[in-house]
Amino acid sequence: MVSARVIVQAPSHLGLRAAGVQGLPEALLAAGFAERVGARRGTRLAPPAFDPAIDAGTGLLNPHGLRVYASRLADAVGAVLDEGAFPIVLGGDCTILLGITLALRRRGRSGLLFCDGHADFYQPEAEPTGEAASMELALVTGRGPDLVTDLEGRGPLLRDEDVVVFGFRDADHAAAEGSQPLAPTIHAMDLWSIRERGAELAARDALTYLERTGGPAAFWVHLDVDVLDDAIMPAVDYHLPDGLTWEELTGVLRTAVASDHATGLDITIFNPTLDPDGRVARSLVDALVAGLTP
């Protein structure tokens, strides 16, 4: 991994009906995140205006805004990559992954270590709320309306076989809600398989897969903080029991970013309006710092 780190702020909730996650960058930066991980503060990208109406043509909230924002975020992330630096993108909701993977796709083939409590594989016909933040993995692998899956004619942005879904625990809930199942061509490691193996060893297994001969040249790390145990991460909008501990998260991050193939990291879904005293933000920053520093 390169030593220089640059923070890109992407405070968008275009893919999520509830507001609050757009305050994530300010909350983590106020808790000292940039200074403690030795990162330079770079671009902050304000999102387009939020439209609460579901688009009739796509079944999504804000599809045109998502497309515009993805292009702008791809430019910002790409500029950091072109410096030879390591972008750390602070969301926002998980739809920022559209812009991130567009930046990667412009540069070739990339993998994704997708650390999330939810598989986020809903497609519009199964998601009546229109929230693309429950669909982003489907979208970046080419499932959904062309408006947001075939960005710049480059879709799908990721190949199924170049994705590891790590730490999800919503399979039963998602199936009951009518979500499409994860494609069998996507490498899936749910919370229970990770616990059986041990978080750090499971992370090494994930990297072995992503770094395989004939695989992608590099990979990105996506961190939705709801991969953490709900008991220690209450500042999220959609709750599930169980999840990773702080120590497990630290071990996973330390393993991932130590790889020469890791090109960047994004952090999403933390909602500081649900953390009025800042206690959870401070604990999150402590864990991130422990995972991102030698």
Residue ranges and their predicted role:
Residues 8, 92, 115-117, 166, ...:
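Active-site flanking residues adjacent to catalytic metal/cofactor-binding acidic residues
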Residues 119, 170, 225-229:
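Short, glycine/acidic-enriched loop or turn micro-motifs at the edges of active sites
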Residues 166-173, 245-250:
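A general structural motif
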Residues 2-88, 100, 106, 184-294:
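Catalytic cores of soluble, metal-dependent hydrolases
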Residues 114-117, 141, 162-170, 190-192, ...:
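Short, structured patches in soluble enzyme cores that scaffold and shape functional sites
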